A protein has these predicted regions:
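Acidic carboxylate-rich catalytic motifs and surrounding loops in phosphoryl-/glycosyl-chemistry enzymes
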Residues: 45-50, 170-174
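Catalytic metal-binding/acid-base residues of hydrolase active sites
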Residues: 11-12, 49, 89, 133
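Serine-esterase "nucleophile elbow" of acetyl-processing enzymes
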Residues: 1-48, 54-59, 72-74, 82, ...
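Alpha-helical cap/lid subdomain in secreted, periplasmic
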Residues: 63-205
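Short, solvent-exposed polar/charged micro-motifs at secondary-structure junctions
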Residues: 53-57, 177-180
Length: 205
């Protein structure tokens, strides 16, 4: 059996934009992924509301994805694949990051995984970087964040090309809910699960 770790934020945790609570278990994308992969894979969901790639949140503690990643990898090792799906929270104005800075922060996570020795027999796990979809309809007060979210695709592509890692850009694959503009509804989680399944099978064939 192979093991994949899904490392992300509230969209991996399963935030429900309709209710403001958590999606039913069967509607979260890592659970959908587990069901699609069948008995071949163990799927570990490591999603946290508000998690960033590598920035300290001035309001909430423990949201920096870079500081928790290595302990997380070691907790769940050996891992065949790590899926990193972060970047949505990093475009918030309080972090003052450009799209290129967000991509570089995710690149830092890529390097942590590659030097972690948490794959089979002390190797590095395979990697899949997921670029969040652009924000959909948002309140005007988030217009700058929405604009920055539309720039992530190109920035992530450049970073993944430089680091030679697999990229899944969700722009055109899954859409954020119009209710809040940046969380996935049930249709969105289904689309993410399908796309990640396809890439996992390609990565591990």
């Amino acid at each position: 059996m192979r093991t994949v770790l899904c490392y992300g934020d509230s969209n991996t945790w399963g935030y429900d934009p309709t209710t403001g609570t958590r999606l039913p278990r069967e509607s979260r994308w890592p659970v959908r992924l587990r069901r699609a992969l069948g008995g071949e894979w163990e799927v570990i969901a490591e999603g946290l509301n508000g998690r960033t790639a590598a920035s300290d949140d001035p309001i909430w503690e423990g949201r920096n994805g870079a500081t928790y990643l290595l302990p997380c990898l070691r907790t769940h090792m050996p891992l065949d694949v790590v899926v990193i799906y972060l970047g949505t929270n990093d475009v918030a104005m309080r972090y003052s990051l450009r799209a290129e800075d967000v991509a570089a922060s995710v690149g830092r996570l890529v390097r942590i995984v590659r030097t972690s020795e948490t794959g089979p027999d002390g190797s590095a796990p395979e990697l899949l970087v997921v670029c969040p979809p652009p924000f959909s309809r948002v309140d005007p007060q988030y217009a700058l964040e929405a604009e920055k979210s539309r720039e992530l695709g190109a920035a992530f592509a450049a970073m993944c090309s430089e680091l030679r890692c697999e990229l899944l850009d969700l722009d055109g694959v899954a859409a954020c809910s119009d209710l809040d503009g940046f969380h996935l509804d049930a249709d969105g989680t289904a689309a993410v699960a399908r796309a990640v399944e396809e890439r996992l099978r390609r990565l591990t064939d």
